[in-house]
Amino acid sequence: MHIMEGYLPAIWCIVWFVVSIPVVAYGVYKLNKLVKEERGILPVLAVAGAFIFVLSSLKMPSVTGSCSHPTGTGIGAIIFGPAITAVLSTIVLIYQALFLAHGGLTTLGANVFSMGIVGPIVAYLIYKTGMKAKLNFYLIVFLAATLGDWATYIVTSTELALAFPAGDILTFGGFFSSFSKFVAIFAITQVPLAIVEGAVSALLFKYIIQAKSDLLVEMKVIGEPLVRKLRGLPA
């Protein structure tokens, strides 16, 4: 998913920076507010950030100028919301660009938009919808992480197709031709990777509920009755 350094035309680098900066700035505001109100959340914040870093570093060859890997943003989106997850993703993406030659600084805006903004938004919406529908909790986490991952790659395909349309982008034919090719190539690796990510995310959330369920209840991520049920405690 990480679009490599220098691959996008300058105009698209600027566009994605302009789109991403306000969301990340809002996320910084929310993160500062959260940490001031609840210092005990720092260990969970660290786990969410580490999960994003580890999973998104497991890259596989894919579309020219990009790669395939899990994103790890579903957990952060469920617990902290999309804005704070955008900040965590930005920190991870900057580190990977500087020290792992994974992604790039000029393409940072595009990578943040796909992995740090759209993916978490989709995961968050899936989680909220699933909770309202009273689905199995771990199934909700699985779906949120899986679909959030797929959304990231759909957006990355869109970014690449806009930058490199097969023909005149103004006719949209060139865009859709390129988009379909990028999506098809990504799907070979990303469909199974996202499913694995969903399963791992559900397992990690099970651990978090056992270790820090009080913070999740306090942040209104999950209600006390459901926590007791998931932990096998009497109602």
UniProtKB/Swiss-Prot annotation:
Part of the energy-coupling factor (ECF) transporter complex CbiMNOQ involved in cobalt import. Pathway: Cofactor biosynthesis; adenosylcobalamin biosynthesis. NCBIfam families: cbiM, PRK08319.1. GO terms for molecular function: cobalt ion transmembrane transporter activity. It comes from Methanosarcina barkeri (strain Fusaro / DSM 804). Belongs to the CbiM family. The keyword Magnesium does not apply. HAMAP family: CbiM (MF_01462). Its main location: membrane. Keywords: Cell membrane, Cobalamin biosynthesis, Cobalt, Cobalt transport, Ion transport, Membrane, Transmembrane, Transmembrane helix, Transport. This is Putative cobalt transport protein CbiM 2. GO terms for cellular component: ATP-binding cassette (ABC) transporter complex. Forms an energy-coupling factor (ECF) transporter complex composed of an ATP-binding protein (A component, CbiO), a transmembrane protein (T component, CbiQ) and 2 possible substrate-capture proteins (S components, CbiM and CbiN) of unknown stoichimetry. It is found in: Cell membrane. PANTHER family: COBALT TRANSPORT PROTEIN CBIM, PTHR43627. GO terms for biological process: cobalamin biosynthetic process. It is a multi-pass membrane protein. The chain crosses the membrane at residues 8-28, 40-60, 74-94, 107-127, 135-155, 160-180, 185-205. The lineage of its organism: Archaea, Methanobacteriati, Methanobacteriota, Stenosarchaea group, Methanomicrobia. Gene3D superfamilies: 1.10.1760.20. Coiled coil: none annotated. Pfam families: CbiM (PF01891).
